A protein has these predicted regions:
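Short, hinge-like loop/turn segments at secondary-structure boundaries
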Residues: 23-25, 101-104, 148-152
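Conserved SAM-binding loop
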Residues: 1-95, 118, 205-206
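Single conserved hydrophobic/aromatic residue that forms the stacking wall/gate
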Residues: 196-206
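Conserved catalytic loop of SAM-dependent methyltransferase domains
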Residues: 132-169, 194
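A SAM-dependent methyltransferase catalytic signature shared across enzymes that methylate proteins
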Residues: 117-134
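Conserved Class I S-adenosyl-L-methionine
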Residues: 136, 170-198
Length: 206
């Protein structure tokens, strides 16, 4: 399918890392393009109604005035376009904050914990219509709890490294047992809450 994809972050280092990682999945095609750049999510360098789809993954919890990012996304998204947003789910994130003060104070880290109703309402109030909700990465939450518990030694911790190996194995092999565990645990300890919405704005209102 034809696709022009743009990826942005405020961190130049992270953008370079994304470019490097993308090369492993790049498929040469005249019908596809992928560009990366550094920008502020509150001031996207695009005209109104530029995109069919916008994904904002694990970003809003880092931004004090996150509403301005949602408004900017609404501006660049075409009427009827799809906006997918994810933030950390409340309970697993709350546990991280309780386990480690350093986790809270990490530069560029999370400045809030979203409750689902607030998250959903904040998006709907800015011109989006709710489509569906999805939870993900329940098996990843214990990994972050372990990092918070052993924050000072997390780079060398045996148990953290082993759990990371388990997560990589799970992602690569996708065994039936972990699929069942993920499904059962998602309503309780899913790491991420995802919302899928549609831009309900009329083109003439832009």
């Amino acid at each position: 399918a034809d696709a022009d994809v743009f990826g942005f972050d405020m961190s130049h280092v992270d953008v370079l890392k994304a470019q490097t990682n993308f090369k492993e999945f790049d498929e040469s095609s005249s019908n596809k393009s992928c560009s990366f750049g550094v920008t502020d999510g509150r001031k996207l360098p695009f005209n109104n109604n530029s995109f069919d789809y916008v994904i904002c993954s694990e970003v809003l919890e880092h931004i004090i005035d996150f509403e301005s990012v949602i408004e900017e996304i609404e501006r660049v998204l075409k009427p009827g376009g799809i906006f997918a947003a994810s933030v950390p789910k409340y309970l697993p994130e709350w546990i991280c904050w309780k386990l480690s003060k350093a986790y809270q104070e990490m530069p560029g880290g999370h400045v809030r914990i979203f409750k689902y109703r607030h998250f959903k309402k904040s998006i709907e109030q800015r011109g989006f219509s709710f489509l569906k909700r999805h939870w993900n990465h329940a098996l990843h939450s214990p990994y972050w709890w372990l990092q918070c518990m052993f924050w000072e030694t997390k780079e060398t911790s045996w148990i953290i490294n082993k759990y990371h190996d388990f997560l990589v194995w799970d992602m690569m092999k996708k065994p039936f047992l972990t699929k069942v565990l993920e499904f059962v645990l998602q309503p309780i300890i899913a790491k991420s809450c995802l919302l899928y919405t549609s831009d309900a704005a009329d083109d003439t209102s832009r």
